[in-house]
Amino acid sequence: MAKKVGVLLFIDLQPLPDSVEQWVKKTYHAELSGGATLQIVFNTQEACKLDVGTSVEAVVSLMHTPGRHSPSFLAEVARVLNPGGSFLVLEPLLVETQEQKYSSTQTNAGLERNLLLAGFVNSEVDFVTGVEIAKACTTSSVALNLVAVKSKKPSWDSASVFQLRKGSSQKGRARTNGNHQPVKFTAGDVMDDVLSMSKSVVKLDLTSNFKDDDEELIDEDDLLTEEDLKAPEIPKAESCAPTKKACKNCTCGRAELEEKEEETKLTAAQINNPTSSCGSCGLGDAFRCAGCPYRGMPTFKLGEKITLGESWLVADA
């Protein structure tokens, strides 16, 4: 019977340094317990394909060549890694401020993005310096920073099915904790979701018959002042109202109004032989002053009789 593979190690460095194998076995001793073995894959290419039945608890990928952790390679690792398994990537990477000299070279942000798209979560980036595993995988051909990225595969897998529990039939709402035990809501659980209510209660007495003799009633007449009780003064009518014209001793101002009306009336002489002291009366109302006697009359020529034009004598349709 074939032994179960606990940890899968990808590396493009041969021969394999003893320090690397010792470090992997020490770090992943829990995954290698119970008879599980360490499987090592050398010279990994970008289009790496593993056996269909491969299933491991942890994957370690140590590459001294930049750009080996392509999206297709990360997707293959995600396929063989069990849900909840850990994944460690070690690769020379450029910092974001450096110019990319090689098309296969990635940055920290680019590698994290590819890990996320492949389905890995909780990625943590660490710069590895002064460690034996880092010395074994460094290269002098390109000035890069050796970066270790730790991530995990979610505990759930794609197309996973979860059964929803029905609500508790007991009185009151219930919820479940991590041990799947029903927990009842308390008043403290909902204090943030409801408005605080005052403990004081306003009591209304609706038994009163409103016939208490001790109650004092206010007389509305007491609210009136002496000025309110005075009768209003009726305005006096004009002294010459019954007559058609103002009387001799007019004091109401009617005589002045009649004088102004007389001044504005045109005489026969003004119609037959119109004159103008300003010279603008015959041009129309737009050029006439406010007290002009010719206001409302059509345009005319000075010295000629004022007549209405034919358009004035035709009724509007």
UniProtKB/Swiss-Prot annotation:
Residue ranges, annotated region (Fe-S binding site A): 240-252
Binding site for [2Fe-2S] cluster: C240, C247, C250, C252
Primary location group: cytoplasm
A GO cellular component entry from the record: mitochondrial intermembrane space
The keyword Nucleus is assigned to this record: no
BP-aspect Gene Ontology terms: iron-sulfur cluster assembly
Keywords for the protein's UniProt record, in alphabetical order: 2Fe-2S, 4Fe-4S, Cytoplasm, Iron, Iron-sulfur, Metal-binding, Mitochondrion
Job description of the protein: Component of the cytosolic iron-sulfur (Fe-S) protein assembly (CIA) machinery. Required for the maturation of extramitochondrial Fe-S proteins. Part of an electron transfer chain functioning in an early step of cytosolic Fe-S biogenesis, facilitating the de novo assembly of a [4Fe-4S] cluster on the cytosolic Fe-S scaffold complex. Electrons are transferred from NADPH via a FAD- and FMN-containing diflavin oxidoreductase.
Spans annotated as N-terminal SAM-like domain: 1-162
Entry protein name: Anamorsin homolog 2
Endpoints of the signal sequence: none
Compartment annotation: Cytoplasm; Mitochondrion intermembrane space
Position of sequence motif Cx2C motif 2: 289-292
UniProt region (Fe-S binding site B), positions on chain: 278-292
